[in-house]
């Protein structure tokens, strides 16, 4: 919820934060636009015209924006746990009738009850690695029930090379990531911490920041990272008939599962 009366002010603030978010994310994802293009291309190739798309852990709406721009008949429902990101998304896209944003917490086994399916496509980008393995497994089974017949699930994320059996690949990938980040941050792009600091200090979102701090209070530590093979096996077990990688740059993949 915005803390100002003028929605135009909130929209301008949200647009600026969204731009800074996108720049910050590109520092971590060198070919983010290609990742997004792959996702939108696969939706267009696999689903019918005018697809209904669910964006998991949508953040401030960047992937949803790419989808509706690439697919004029598409509509996107974005779900996220974070009230600050949702507030920014709702303000940034308040005039976009083909996008809506819903609060949902994947740690809650009943999260999908807040979502009216089915969907032609379910997507996510740089988000699901935050989930604990048991939550991710349950989520993939939920997605298999939410997506319609011949529907598609697409997840763009970094799937790390194994440091023991793929040591060289992991080393050169980390060197590449460091080089890209150093260049971006050196030219003034927000760091991850810097973006959040700027967003939380924005008066427009004071209420959302308070809510965010309550939600994330006591939540510390990163989830163990599952290898890409494990992701694909879970999706097979969940009932998807075809699974595989449809795009890759080093450890950055778009994995695809067709129902």
Regions found by a protein language model. Give the residues of each.
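A conserved beta-strand element that flanks and buttresses the S-adenosyl-L-methionine
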Residues: 123
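Class I SAM-dependent methyltransferase SAM/SAH-binding core
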Residues: 54, 62-109
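Short alpha-helix
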Residues: 223-238
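Conserved class I S-adenosyl-L-methionine
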Residues: 1-47, 62-66, 154-191
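Conserved glycine-rich SAM-binding loop
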Residues: 59
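Core SAM-dependent methyltransferase catalytic element
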Residues: 238-259
């Amino acid at each position: 919820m915005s803390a100002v009366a003028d929605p135009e002010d909130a929209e301008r603030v949200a647009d600026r934060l969204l731009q800074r978010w996108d720049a910050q994310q590109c520092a971590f994802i060198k070919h983010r636009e290609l990742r997004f293009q792959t996702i939108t291309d696969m939706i267009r190739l696999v689903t019918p015209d005018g697809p209904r798309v669910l964006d998991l852990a949508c953040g401030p709406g960047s992937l949803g924006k790419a989808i509706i721009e690439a697919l004029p008949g598409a509509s996107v429902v974005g779900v996220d746990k974070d009230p600050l990101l949702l507030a920014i998304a709702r303000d940034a896209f308040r005039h976009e009738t083909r996008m809506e944003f819903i609060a949902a917490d994947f740690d809650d086994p009943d999260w999908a009850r807040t979502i009216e399916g089915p969907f032609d496509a379910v997507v996510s980008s740089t988000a699901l690695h935050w989930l604990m393995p048991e939550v991710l497994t349950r989520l993939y089974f939920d997605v298999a029930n939410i997506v319609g017949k011949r529907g598609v699930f697409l997840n763009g994320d970094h799937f790390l090379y194994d440091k023991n059996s793929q040591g060289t690949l992991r080393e050169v990938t980390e060197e590449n990531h460091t080089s890209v980040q150093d260049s971006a941050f050196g030219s003034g792009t927000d760091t991850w911490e810097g973006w959040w600091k700027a967003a939380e200090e924005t008066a427009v979102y004071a209420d959302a920041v308070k809510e965010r701090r309550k939600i994330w209070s006591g939540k510390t530590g990163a989830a163990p990272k599952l290898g890409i093979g494990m992701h694909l096996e879970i999706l097979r077990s969940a009932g998807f008939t075809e699974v595989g990688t449809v795009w890759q740059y080093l450890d950055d993949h778009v994995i695809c599962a067709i129902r």
